[in-house]
A protein has these predicted regions:
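Hydrophobic transmembrane alpha-helices of multi-pass small-molecule transport proteins
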Residues: 93, 98, 122, 168-191, ...
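Specific transmembrane alpha-helical segments of multi-pass solute transporters/efflux pumps
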Residues: 69-73, 105-143, 148, 185, ...
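Hydrophobic/small/kink-forming positions within alpha-helical transmembrane segments
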Residues: 68, 119, 123, 127, ...
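Specific alpha-helical transmembrane segments that line the substrate/conduction pathway
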Residues: 85-96, 131-164, 292-311
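Hydrophobic/aromatic residues within transmembrane alpha-helices
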Residues: 77, 86, 132, 162-164, ...
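Transmembrane alpha-helical segments that form core, pore/gating elements
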Residues: 64-75, 95-98, 156-162, 193-255
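Loop-to-transmembrane-helix transition segments
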Residues: 55-63, 102-131, 206-215, 251, ...
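C-terminal transmembrane-helix exit sites in multi-pass transporters
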Residues: 99-105, 152-177, 304-323
Length: 345
């Protein structure tokens, strides 16, 4: 590999340069599948140090594509390993992947107050996301729950305005209202924006929908806190480890669904973990060296991309009213984003 020569000099984990002396020895000790994995990790580090801003932006956009698969893959995995067991397996594999890419988290860089609250917000977010999707009763409900989760961009922007002093135009309220009307349209089912339709739909699985809403709030709180304290580096690996431990504890204490390790189950677990872990890796490259404005704008369309993926992967039947609501959610997020921009576009 041409990359091996560069690895002799530096091997960046996104936080610091880690010196490696015997790269050839490490590489030669791997079997063929692990050599491929090693090369993938090495390429990510190599790209993070040797690309232009436009290339970094393009790589960061891959995260949008990867994260669009997460909802449908979590659902598919839960059908094979159960909601709790499947989530535990996914986050365990994601933890390993993130630690290999970013290295061991350096918790000394953070104050204890930040670690405490960030852990609560991040872990709460990931638990609510995985379990709300895992306990969905059907494919359509999976996509609806995922759409409620995608209120997080709107909540994040509002958090930045209310708690971090982010200046905003008055019409940010229009974006907020538009997003909620979009969710109401989605939850109304085939009847569109209807209170009776929303009530009938939500009462079939109130816990799932409430967990999805809590997920959006937790993630917005985590982003707002991290931006407020201006935390440097990446503590995601530590938070993913906490999520994994809690899920395994829940599984062994009260789990009733046995883990199925057939080829299909393992495939879904690896795919879900890869989309989650590699998504963070390429997003880190994008936001550190690319155009953050482009990446932020693209991320607001993840709800539509995710719904498109779900309609094929888990065969979710999606009506015209659903797409109208999804479009309103995206439009509301974009309006909120534009209302906080300091320069016109």
């Amino acid at each position: 590999l041409q990359i091996e020569g560069r690895l002799k000099q530096s091997f960046s984990d996104g936080l610091e340069t880690v010196k490696i002396i015997n790269v050839e020895t490490i590489y030669s000790n791997y079997d063929k599948p692990n050599k491929t994995i090693f090369s993938t990790y090495a390429m990510i580090h190599f790209l993070s140090q040797n690309i232009s801003s436009k290339q970094a932006t393009a790589i960061g956009l891959l995260a949008v594509a990867l994260w669009s698969f997460v909802i449908s893959l979590i659902r598919s995995l839960s059908l094979h390993m159960g909601a709790v067991g499947g989530a535990a397996m996914m986050y365990t594999l994601s933890t390993v992947l993130i630690w290999l890419i970013f290295g061991r988290p350096h918790l000394r860089n953070y104050n204890r107050g930040y670690l405490l609250w960030a852990s609560i917000f991040f872990v709460g977010c990931e638990l609510c996301l995985s379990l709300s999707v895992g306990f969905a009763q059907n494919a359509r409900q999976t996509v609806e729950i995922g759409m409620v989760n995608y209120l997080w961009p709107t909540f994040t922007i509002l958090g930045a305005v209310c708690f971090n002093g982010q200046p905003a135009k008055w019409w940010i309220g229009i974006g907020f209202v538009l997003s909620f009307f979009g969710i109401a349209t989605v939850l109304g089912g085939d009847g569109g924006l209807s209170l009776s339709g929303i009530y009938h739909n939500v009462r079939t699985n109130p816990v799932g929908y409430l967990m999805a809403l809590a997920d959006a709030l937790f993630w917005a709180a985590y982003c707002t806190l991290t931006a407020r304290v201006k935390a440097e580096g990446s503590s995601v690996g530590f938070f993913f480890m906490l999520v994994s431990l809690l899920l395994w504890a829940e599984y062994f204490i009260g789990g009733t669904h046995s883990l199925n390790f057939d080829a299909e189950s393992v495939g879904y677990a690896l795919a879900a973990a890869s989309c989650m872990g590699l998504g963070y890796a390429v997003w880190n490259i994008g936001i550190s060296r690319g155009n953050m404005t482009v990446l932020a704008g693209a991320s607001y369309f993840i709800p539509v991309f995710s719904a498109l993926v779900s309609s094929f992967v888990i065969s979710a039947p999606l009506s015209v009213q659903f797409w109208q609501g999804a479009g309103m959610v995206c439009a509301g997020s974009v309006v909120c984003w534009l209302a906080t921009r300091r320069k016109s576009i």
